[in-house]
Amino acid sequence: MINEIKKDAQTRMQKSLESLTHAFTRIRTGKAHPSILGGVMVPYYGADTPLSQVANVTVKDSRTLQVVAFERNMLAAVDKAIQSSGLGFNPTNLGELLLISMPALTEETRKGFTKQARDAAEDARVAVRNIRRDALSQLKDLVKDKEISEDEERRAADDVQKLTDKFVADIEVAVKQKEADLMAV
């Protein structure tokens, strides 16, 4: 029972870390990478569809993305969706494909993106702490139901705390790495 609680907490904490890593891919650095456009939704036959399902996004060079729509008549809709996405991109329509040049990050935008990264990291830390709280609550319930002793509960609580400390440290490493990527000129 104790092992199940610890395993569940570890799995959920790992998912929080993965969620943070995924959130970091949406924050752009100075380099071009297709995942920057991952959140762009394109109107396709009346429904908003992810860009990846209506077009192929590739890296042309370190500062340029190339977008090729699967259907040529969708190119204008893809262009408009990218412009209105709030990412600050203005695609160049070449008839068969779109080119998106990544503007250089100013000091102000770097600081804004760094703040976004820190906010995402704080959300992940809060999620990990909430998972710890849930696990400790489950352990206390087991003691209350006399399924485990208080000593076992204390040992398991220490293990859960060590797990929490490990994941909080991993989050810290991830945010420091993202900040370094953002501040690199």
From Swiss-Prot:
One GO term of the biological process aspect: cytoplasmic translational termination
Compartments where located: Cytoplasm
Residue runs in coiled coils: none
An example molecular function term from Gene Ontology annotations: ribosomal large subunit binding
SS bond partners: none
Pfam families reported in the protein's UniProt record: RRF
SUPFAM superfamilies, alphabetized: Ribosome recycling factor, RRF (SSF55194)
Keyword terms, alphabetized: Cytoplasm, Protein biosynthesis
Major localization listed first in the record, in broad terms: cytoplasm
Cellular component terms (Gene Ontology): cytosol
Superkingdom: Bacteria
NCBIfam families reported for this sequence: frr
Family: Belongs to the RRF family.
Function: Responsible for the release of ribosomes from messenger RNA at the termination of protein biosynthesis. May increase the efficiency of translation by recycling ribosomes from one round of translation to another.
Name assigned to this protein: Ribosome-recycling factor
Naturally occurring in which organism (per UniProt): Pseudomonas syringae pv. tomato (strain ATCC BAA-871 / DC3000)
Higher taxonomy: Bacteria, Pseudomonadati, Pseudomonadota, Gammaproteobacteria, Pseudomonadales
